[in-house]
């Protein structure tokens, strides 16, 4: 092999890429995707892709690409037929016959399977052999064009078809299809390099029915009709280098709206929704203006498209130059509650256009930078649009969320470093999944990861200032946009990738500040800080003695050393102090500025410069302190528990102007049920200039305090007189005024107060009759005729209020509840709910909010024993065809019923829906709800916990969810919640089995198979070079399928070694090719001259959970159909793994000669495998993963 070609390539790469070292031996520069047939009836897609690649090493003879679900018909490189192999170990993670049921084992195997096809490790499911005729061409590093014909039949992930079963043509029915998925999932719908770090330009062509519209990335160059005018082809060009993971598609009979403010923006929605689309998107141009202004940089693409579709995978999915939204975000001008939520979704998607789509990431460990920046600039937009109060409330909410999650699960690591120096190889050993790859992450963990990323960006901004922060973003964007315009210097494109080190370097260049300690604290390690604070005032020294303790031993916590701000409000004003938190300092002395109370009355200055009169009678006469706050700016990711007197919390609630401080004091006052607390809360409710969310929280706190003070409470029920004064008629206080929701603050308060009032209880722990009558009157006299806004959310809250008023039934002699002996109050509630439900059928409300509330209320009545507990109603509402919010509410009730009544039948019904429901989001939600409200947990004895359930869930996560990463990770979460990490307790002890130890090359007798053996297997996989004599027997998840040419003698020796040790053929039930085996054990026999024939096995098995029948003849039928009849010539072996193909040979009835040769395990191969043999290229070849036949309880080993 001449080395001359290699060196220049390597030098080039180093010089141009500035730190980005591609894991692939080639550079992709352009890709064509052409889908020329989409059949909505059959839910199938036919097309081809063409990838233009430049080899970067001379001896490139294998090209690995990503492809899942696609049936590959034919591969050509520069118009020469190329042989290929398809191997996807993620289809079935653990061997179907393995009796392993512990999650530790599964997580290791799953992480290995994912990295075996991870493009960022240079791997892929599809391995293409470069024809020998092109080897000289490759050595000269000349361009290769790879042409792949493929089809997709009823895809279960990646592309989602929505085909309503009504009359009419597909366009009239509103049938549409769109791409979807979690992280990099483009491989599910066309072959590509599915990595965020491999950028190229794109040409996208889609041929669809004339009534349909295809929306994709980039500029629509032209639309061409066929001669008969029945079909048309949309041609899109994306000239900005983009990763395949950011390519998307939506096809449907869309109505089109060009944005009236920005003509380069186009909006698409399903038929008849155009008026809603106009209103919903009318605001978008302001978001554009805001981002362009703060980033001082134009929007990077030449156009932007928003597509609103049904049955969305997530509410917002951002792709290069287009975003796909759920159609449920559309709303009219009459809707109040949805408006801010939809605007937030639009703003989020646009932030991700800059950071996430235009600027991509180098590797998974740099993901936090993109998620952090897009979340941070979205926060800035929120501050400008909804105001500082809303922004600070959001930051506090996000902080509470991440703190609660980290304390519960043990920490979220933003920048995982693997296998490097001091860092442990498993930085997240407390988790039940690997964090080395996005596809193994729990969905909840990933949401929290995004939340933490933007909070950390805010901490960086606190450290270097917002001005510098925005300069850094501008620098990243400018470099990227310069790079993106270099059409012929693709090595420059790596400037469009962001890495953690590059980002930090930018920060230090721009700001000159060293933020390394901050990064070390929050990015390179997981955990949050837990502070406990208390104080004493030393009158003699006029000093505040503050004691701050930390808990850094609990899971999810870390030790904090550094500055901490404390704000003290004294009589003479508000003072900030910065304490230095050291290793062991607990006590801090803070000098006070004011002497204790003066006699002369004077106004007290607040933090914001305002001066107010205060009634100081409640305070301690010896102390000038009004209230104290620790870390008021939330500049540490922390939880603070601070002790101060009740009057201090009351002053803080009344007079502190920061909404976060007010929220904190409301939370603290729950512990002080006194008349003074009651008064402070009532004052806040009456204050119109107080932030509406604080007033809403005060309602619920007041209800709790009233319940604690029930024996001493005087006057009408809490909040009733206030509500009457604010919202009822003067002349008739029990009749509510005609609705007028012009003031949104009072609208939210009017909606919330009755819900909080319904939580009031009298001395007998029942809801006071007066309150229930009051709520029923609100419903009865509700009048929305003169209101310009819809009252559907308000009415839904009234039903929630009715549900809140329900208390447990008192049963006499176990009487059965019937409608005749219902408690009269409950009868009234039930009548209202029934009336509302019937009204909904005639006049449905927006998003069916009322039906949702009714279903929840019925479940409350069931749980409290007023109506018979029966899931039938909920099951009927949960069926496919109802609006998604109704389905989720109904399913929530069924999940709850399953837990309370321990119903195996309902659990099975739910599991069946997880497998078979047409909507991916619903399947995901059911798993999520079962995890949050499980029928039992790992430490409980439960009749539901049995071997059949373990097997069922194991199969679900092992092979039943391979089409959707999110679903699989959800199944793993559920399995963990129910059974924990080790072997489920309800299983019998496994029989004695043999464990094959690949490291020692010997079998070990082992009663319970311990995860250590897994570690052994993994090392064997990751370091194949350490066992030259075991080349053929490699772990199916091997991540380093080495590229060097194979010495065939070694292969034959290893085959002899393995066949001698593992007598696989003698074993009748080798599961290598049962229908449920993943493609890792399927042979793809691809004859060279079979242009266009369907020669690859379909990689789309119909997963079902009734996997009782193991490999019977019928099961193999689909596989055999896919083999080619011409494949009876001797088969050449071409990768290390394929050498062990004989394990599954007895499943193929085509290659008899090959089988005869091996029948007695004599490896006397007559033909030579020479590097330049032309014969070799004419022969078909086979592939099968050697270890595919390996059960963890292996057959006997005999030497």
UniProtKB/Swiss-Prot annotation:
The keyword Transcription regulation applies. It is linked to Neurodevelopmental disorder with feeding difficulties, thin corpus callosum, and foot deformity: An autosomal recessive disorder characterized by impaired intellectual development, microcephaly, delayed psychomotor development, pyramidal signs, thin corpus callosum, and foot deformity. GO terms for cellular component: nucleoplasm; nucleus; transcription factor TFIID complex; transcription factor TFTC complex. CDD domains: M1_like_TAF2. GO terms for biological process: G2/M transition of mitotic cell cycle; mRNA transcription by RNA polymerase II; positive regulation of DNA-templated transcription; positive regulation of transcription initiation by RNA polymerase II; regulation of DNA repair; regulation of transcription by RNA polymerase II; RNA polymerase II preinitiation complex assembly; transcription initiation at RNA polymerase II promoter. PubMed:9418870 was unable to show an association between TAF2 and TFIID. The modification Phosphoserine is found at residues 1185, 1188, 1194, 1196, 1198. One of its GO terms (molecular function) is transcription cis-regulatory region binding. Its main location: nucleus. Belongs to the TAF2 family. This is Transcription initiation factor TFIID subunit 2. Residues 1093-1102, 1182-1199 have a biased composition (Polar residues). Gene3D superfamilies: Neutral Protease Domain 2 (1.10.390.10), tricorn interacting facor f3 domain (2.60.40.1730). It comes from the Eukaryota. Residues 1-23, 1067-1102, 1136-1199 are annotated as: Disordered. Keywords: Disease variant, Intellectual disability, Nucleus, Phosphoprotein, Transcription, Transcription regulation. InterPro entries: Aminopeptidase_N-like_N_sf, ARM-type_fold, Peptidase_M4/M1_CTD_sf, TAF2. The TFIID basal transcription factor complex plays a major role in the initiation of RNA polymerase II (Pol II)-dependent transcription. TFIID recognizes and binds promoters with or without a TATA box via its subunit TBP, a TATA-box-binding protein, and promotes assembly of the pre-initiation complex (PIC). The TFIID complex consists of TBP and TBP-associated factors (TAFs), including TAF1, TAF2, TAF3, TAF4, TAF5, TAF6, TAF7, TAF8, TAF9, TAF10, TAF11, TAF12 and TAF13. TAF2 forms a promoter DNA binding subcomplex of TFIID, together with TAF7 and TAF1. SUPFAM superfamilies: ARM repeat, Leukotriene A4 hydrolase N-terminal domain, Metalloproteases ('zincins'), catalytic domain. Component of the TFIID basal transcription factor complex, composed of TATA-box-binding protein TBP, and a number of TBP-associated factors (TAFs), including TAF1, TAF2, TAF3, TAF4, TAF5, TAF6, TAF7, TAF8, TAF9, TAF10, TAF11, TAF12 and TAF13. Interacts with TAF2C1. Component of the TFTC-HAT complex. Signal peptide: none annotated. It is found in: Nucleus. The keyword Ligase does not apply. Expressed in all tissues tested.
